[in-house]
Structure formats: structure tokens, C-alpha cells
Amino acid sequence: MKTQFIELTGKTLLDVVNEGEIDFKQLHDAGVVGDSILRINPHGEIELRCKSNWMLVGGLIGSFEERLTELTGLDWAE
């Protein structure tokens, strides 16, 4: 089975997370900005879309799944 993801922008990611669920400095240092394209898998791993690949830039902890699907309007997809 392939890994599933939900794609979102950096701005939407900020709307999804609660304080303490993510290391914002780590994301900033990796180059994540408001219009960055990101994807998150069900394990909470966050990847940043680069020119020719996806780069792992951090991870979420906590109960983010329901907020993620509600705020993006998306379901998990391969």
C-alpha cells in the first residue's frame, strides 16, 4: 500500500497546528513560507515540495488528523 498524504500550503499548516505540535523554527529554517506546497502523511511527517523532489522538514504530534481534513476539505490520497 502506498503512503497517503494531504497537501496544503504553509499558511494552511499554521491554521491546522496547535502550539507545541510542531517546531516552527525547524520549518522556517527549512524554507517553509506561507505559499510553500507541503504534504503530510497520516504519521504526521511533513514534506516540502522542492523543484524536483519532496524534502522531509518536520513532523506533527498530537491529534491533528481531524483538523487537517476539516480545514483543507481533503481526504487522504496516494
Where are the predicted features?
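Acidic, low-complexity, intrinsically disordered interaction modules
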Residues: 18-69
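Mixed-charge, Lys/Arg-enriched low-complexity segments
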Residues: 2-13, 53-78
